[in-house]
């Protein structure tokens, strides 16, 4: 990350000069948009389904900064924009309203395949890479199952990056500063693009970006935490600190130490892409690409609603009258009791070998990617809403003897959820694409992907050990870390397919496309779950599933002249 922080020094070191070329364009001239949605270069008007594009130059000129803003430029697409914290975790893109998972599933990746597939060049991956040095973005609306397979029920979004250019040495540096409502800080972003020839038939293209955006959300109820000494129940870690100490009865009655974390949802992203082009022969090219991105986000970009309970400065006991006063949350205020940071690392490597034959093009694509991430979520409100803290079943802060008073309600409930996930996949695809013929043209191919996913969660009920020690008068420790819930699931998924499309040009203005995709999916999963605070578990389970079938498509296109 330090390398990217110092990337601004490159601006001074390189002193890249930029030639500004003014070009006069006839505003009445129609410019055909070339796309590759059908695996061959063709115009938008010749594609037999609904497609929209946005060029990389348009993305830059419109100062589009993120994927949520990009998709708002296309008709018929919606996405839930909760900021960078959740942007790379779950694919919630919807085309024509079609969705698979609940909109509430944002903090955690899920097993289900999304309804809209995303590709970076020819690699199927949902990565939320920065929108840097793109040639164009293609949005294909409607089912794309025959060519793009699983996850393309609603459509497909393709991010096409710029290839290296042979014999060209040029570069650019772009510095962007931003200001947002709700924050007094200024955001900064630096982008470097450099294209250089290595030999007559080899070229290299570098894209490096670093952005540091300020937050706008104020966490106004953050508990100060620390470690509790061993008074008989063992030491406890990361527990909300009572203002008046941890003795009895202060541990029960003392108000928490609260502070406000202003502009907590900061965003820091470092991105780099290397791309090599090898012009092996006149009709054989090899492109190697490697892209990496690291995200660090300070908190959730979400404002709280409802009543805000403000701890008064003169409060000495949580059970005294007037300890709290009621207020309302401001426009950019969040009431979580803890900061909710997240981090994510994603890397992608791909090889694309293209052979331009006599009347056809053969393309072999090999790619791999890896995504890892973790985040913290405040589960306190969720537990409180269910009545879990004082439930006789859960037993965290249960007044078993019905004493009431200071034992009736936990003083400083604090439930932390720590989540981690990884996703790895290797993908191979080979296809033959015919040139556009007078009567017929076709695409045939094979696809294979092996994917491994891992997800885990640990939930902690902080302060429960000491609370129960004082209540019961004995060592009540079941788990030294006060961990309530431990969950882990691992999955291995193999997806293979053969597919094809045949287009018949019955006339100059009418085409019919027939498509099919024969697929096979195998999925193995194992789960491990335990409730450590009750000393229950682990419970384990394994499952295996297989599915296969054939997708079929018939699509007509009529040109109106």
Predicted features and spans:
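Transmembrane beta-barrel wall of Gram-negative outer-membrane proteins
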Residues: 182-298, 422-428, 432-449, 494-503, ...
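Face-selective signature of the C-terminal outer-membrane beta-barrel domain
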Residues: 344-372, 412-534, 547-555
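Membrane-proximal, glycine/serine-rich, low-complexity loop/turn segments characteristic
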Residues: 25-27, 31, 52, 123, ...
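Solvent-exposed loop segments that connect transmembrane elements
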Residues: 216-262, 300-337, 378-418, 458-488, ...
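Conserved small/polar residues in nucleotide/adenosyl-binding loops
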Residues: 558-561
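Outer-membrane beta-barrel proteins
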Residues: 83, 145, 161, 178-182, ...
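Acidic, small-polar-rich N-terminal luminal/periplasmic segments of exported/outer-membrane proteins
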Residues: 28-166
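Cleavable N-terminal targeting peptides that direct proteins into the secretory/outer-membrane pathway or into
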Residues: 1-25
